[in-house]
Amino acid sequence: MGIIVFYEGNNGTQNIVQTVEDTPGQNFRPVKNDEIRSAKIYGVRQGCEIGVYDSPDGATNDDFCIINVKRETPEYTINTFERSYEDEYVVVTFIRNNGLDGKISRIKIN
């Protein structure tokens, strides 16, 4: 099982807000609303999709970001949820409305 650690600061810094496994089918509100700004993934499985949403019910009419894991890696940092990019490990897709970092109210993992 892989581990996803959500952080209060950008670049995987400051306090840990919440730690979860990469088990598919998760859909939850973070333990602290509007705190998360970045994440680190540890051994998260290929094909895992991590979604973070500004909307408390995970609606896509507000800011959201989807991280698709292309390849398992021992440790990888998602520095911000406000940038779309692709590398050998992840595809990150950010849809902007008025900003997402520090405003996350729903997390989905599949």
How should each PLM-predicted stretch be described?
Residues 1-110:
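Compact beta-sheet-dominated domain cores in extracellular/mature segments
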